[in-house]
């Protein structure tokens, strides 16, 4: 059932996946559902809803990624980082979260599903110092763009981008961008079976 739904959703967003990638995505939902009962990783309880709200909500960003090295800040159980890593095996993803149970889950997912292009790090973002900066800094965890830019300003490489995943846009928030940062592009995202606004903001350092 989930496999057929995934197939239809991928076609809807015009994203092609191998049989192995589809299996990994479905197995990720299975692991999330199983671990969630004990670890409380997400408020979404139903696998079909997870497929929409977690997998597809992450994958609509995939075709907009530029570069090879990414960090997903406040990734929780690995969202959007794990679905994006599955679909982009030639890119690398650091998954950053401050809660140990989430990091343990991510590492188990990587081990069981054979995902080799992610590394999970338990750290607060402001304390994290990368050996090499990133082409893209992703997050759907921050309440405000200002918080994201303030805490993650040290992470992108010289021409790196911030990818802020937002629901409904707040005009006031957009007008109060911190100095030194510019919104390069605002992309309206369409998530299959999700009747809610979704936006991707690409932000650069001036």
Curated annotation (Swiss-Prot):
Record InterPro entries: rRNA_ssu_MeTfrase_G, SAM-dependent_MTases_sf
Localization? Cytoplasm
UniProt GO MF annotations: rRNA (guanine-N7-)-methyltransferase activity
Q: What does this protein do?
A: Specifically methylates the N7 position of guanine in position 527 of 16S rRNA.
Family from the record = Belongs to the methyltransferase superfamily. RNA methyltransferase RsmG family.
Gene that this sequence comes from: rsmG
Q: Which NCBIfam families match?
A: rsmG_gidB
HAMAP family registered for this protein in UniProt: 16SrRNA_methyltr_G
Q: E.C. number, please?
A: 2.1.1.170
Q: What is the lineage of its organism?
A: Bacteria, Pseudomonadati, Pseudomonadota, Gammaproteobacteria, Alteromonadales
Q: Which GO terms describe its cellular component?
A: cytosol
Provide the binding site for S-adenosyl-L-methionine. Answer: 74, 79, 125-126, 140
- The entry's protein name is Ribosomal RNA small subunit methyltransferase G
Highest taxon of source: Bacteria
Recorded catalytic activity of this chain's protein: guanosine(527) in 16S rRNA + S-adenosyl-L-methionine = N(7)-methylguanosine(527) in 16S rRNA + S-adenosyl-L-homocysteine
Q: Which UniProt keywords apply?
A: Cytoplasm, Methyltransferase, rRNA processing, S-adenosyl-L-methionine, Transferase
